[in-house]
Amino acid sequence: MNMQESKSIIEVNGVSKFFGEKTALDHVTLNVKKGEFVTILGPSGCGKTTLLRLIAGFQTASEGEIKISGKEITQTPPHKRPVNTVFQKYALFPHLNVYDNIAFGLKLKKMPKQTIEKKVKAALKMVGMTDYEYRDVDSLSGGQQQRVAIARAIVNEPEVLLLDEPLAALDLKMRKDMQMELKEMHKSLGITFVYVTHDQEEALTLSDTIVVMSEGRIQQIGTPIDIYNEPINSFVADFIGESNILNGVMIHDKLVRFCNTEFECVDEGFGENMPVDVVIRPEDLYIFPVSEAAQLTGVVQSSVFKGVHYEMTVLCNGYEFLVQDYHHFEVGALVGLLVKPFDIHIMKKERVCNTFEGKLIDETHVEFLGCNFECAPVTGIEAGSEVKVEVGFDNVILQDNEEDGALTGEVKFILYKGDHYHLTVLSDWDENVFVDTNDVWDDGDRVGITIPPDGIRVIKN
């Protein structure tokens, strides 16, 4: 890659976006190289579309700055930025035919008629719609309308093309066809693509670089292979493809314990007996009739044919493993599992308990999360002191009836850890509460939150 290609065309530096008291983006920093195909990936509400709209100029950053080609454009209106945007809903003009839709921006610039005709025909050729220039847009299929929207965007020869979930409205086959066309188009045009999606497969297929977002923050930036093979945390591991994610303990370098069993691994630099997250992809587990080679033995709980492989759930020592393999084992079969050291991925835990800022009210009461909680008797700390409050994940109780809780919240993220669920609950105090539970909840569930006195640990600041 030469110096020109490696130069950043988009620089997002410490950008935040607030909507009232809600933080949509939290100090985001991102550099996009010229000519890259970058995909911003994340679940609904993670901030990916907000970031795209800030780059496009449809919204203004609350903090930080944005540069394109070295020029600061944070406050620059959209029509003065060297970018064009393709939307999910296409935004074509129904009263104009295909040619006039594509030519619209060029006519606004008062370009000569011959120049417009040349550019429009080149754009139509690029998207494979040479014979459609005089068709009404309402007569086109969804895929054809999307091609027209892309042609209208590229005809202006922008430095950056922004695409906001442009394939979401298409059926599966058309979406896959358009993915390949977009990839070829990017290669031919040589301009920078910034693509927003919640579809992990789409991101892995299209991108040079993937930016994974959650809760207004960037979690990881890397190539599709790096993101898939070396996720930085349990959120990324769970969001990108299927994963077995379990609690483990790093005994020492290259030796980890999980599922009540010790395994050799290749990871180093963790502290002895440090709690860690262990990630194993389903395709990296070997399954076979029980033999001495088995590291774990278990019983097949379910088996589903997926076309290119079987997907099986195996219960070992009370932990469920998802396994993908070409060999089929019947439900109820006793099997062995084996995983090679380099297929065990070790990640430092982001946290080992809930930690909150609080205030000691008296010997047996502490205030945090906007509530007054009863706690075990506290000694050596004066009433009224600012304190740190620790609550174990398994010490938080969730209830169906919100009124039964000391406070309320909404389930935002669910991670299965083999023998329990690890939930992220956004409290109405706008702080996350992390919960380990065997109960089954759904994203978006409203819950009451209770913490028993013996589950609260008060620590002097």
UniProtKB/Swiss-Prot annotation:
One of its GO terms (cellular component) is ATP-binding cassette (ABC) transporter complex. It is found in: Cell inner membrane. It comes from Bacteroides fragilis (strain YCH46). It catalyses: ATP + H2O + polyamine-[polyamine-binding protein]Side 1 = ADP + phosphate + polyamineSide 2 + [polyamine-binding protein]Side 1. Part of the ABC transporter complex PotABCD involved in spermidine/putrescine import. Responsible for energy coupling to the transport system. InterPro entries: AAA+_ATPase, ABC_SmlMolc_Importer, ABC_transporter-like_ATP-bd, ABC_transporter-like_CS, Mo/tungstate-bd_C_term_dom, P-loop_NTPase, PotA-like, PotA_ATP-bd. The lineage of its organism: Bacteria, Pseudomonadati, Bacteroidota, Bacteroidia, Bacteroidales. Its main location: membrane. ATP binds at G42, P43, S44, G45, C46, G47, K48, T49. One of its GO terms (molecular function) is ATP hydrolysis activity. Belongs to the ABC transporter superfamily. Spermidine/putrescine importer (TC 3.A.1.11.1) family. Pfam families: ABC_tran, TOBE_2. Its EC number is 7.6.2.11. The complex is composed of two ATP-binding proteins (PotA), two transmembrane proteins (PotB and PotC) and a solute-binding protein (PotD). It is a peripheral membrane protein. Residues 10-240 form the ABC transporter domain. This is Spermidine/putrescine import ATP-binding protein PotA. Keywords: ATP-binding, Cell inner membrane, Cell membrane, Membrane, Nucleotide-binding, Translocase, Transport.
